[in-house]
Amino acid sequence: MTQVRLVKLKLKAGNEQIWLDWCEELKQRRSEVTETLRNEGVLSESCFLSEDEKCVYYFMEAESFERAKEAMEESTFKIDTEHREKRILSLEKSEQLSELFHFEVRS
């Protein structure tokens, strides 16, 4: 079974647009994103904007978060470096939400 994680991150006041622009850019660079996710063993990754636009919710599904973290830290992909920079500039950790359940149906 895969591992899942949902994290609530606060957008840094004054830097919200940096993250929103980055999210749009990621959609344009889909092939780079999928290449790095594959390298990390990440099966899916999603980001959602809260209704008040002060937070984002970040969902990840991976074979192993330990492996994903190691691969991310050792990554030489340009997009990973850019992602870290944008995250540092525009997001601050708020809380990791507790998983109550996760079901998978894959064929």
Q: Model segments located where?
A:
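Short amphipathic alpha-helical segments
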Residues: 17-41
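Short, conserved charged micro-motifs
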Residues: 14-20, 66-70
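General beta-strand recognition
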Residues: 55-57
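Active-site-flanking beta-strand signature of metal-NTP-handling nucleotidyl enzymes
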Residues: 4-10, 59
